[in-house]
Amino acid sequence: GESNDVNPSKIQTEVFRLPSTCFAEENGSIVNSGRWLQWHWKGADAPGIAVTDGEILAGIFTRLRKMYAEEGGPAPEPVLNMTWNYSTPHEPASEEVAMESNGKALADITDPATGAVIVKKGQQLSSFAQLRDDGTTSSGCWIFAGSWTPDGNQMARRDNADPSGLGNTLGWAWAWPRSSAGRRPDPACGAGDR
């Protein structure tokens, strides 16, 4: 074609159609350039044969893992050792994926100064500051640590109160790091504007 001057009959190409739902057809989170991570709920059923991203990725991953287990391949450890213990492995729930992205303690986490337990084994993390590099924590995306805490889904918060009067609705959704949206000065502002 005009934008891609390649003859498909002369190259080894295979096209896969992956009919995915759009964001409004499944529960999940959306993120924007302001670092806001906001939860949304399914608004409508998907048309036709469309399935969730999670179901598509699960199908690819489980087949790939089986292939690696049976045939081997380059760098098999990340594929064979990846955690995939969702309630419904062939279609992970968005809530479970969000909790895994947030992270949890794989062992009791203690305060280095006092030795007191600050996060119990199995508990969701409240902040990226609780992540450890010794294998005692797990997080799918460190900047999302704090988005799903022991108090629940922080992305689903809908408190639009603005007690400061500055347009900071800190109880609405969640922003990283540590839900700090609106708390940092804009680097474009002069010192007097901060």
Report the location of each language-model feature:
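Polar low-complexity intrinsically disordered regions
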Residues: 23, 109, 113-114, 122, ...
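A glycine-rich, hydrophobic/aromatic-adjacent loop/helix-cap motif
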Residues: 133-136, 168
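Beta-rich carbohydrate-recognition modules and glycan-binding surfaces
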Residues: 139
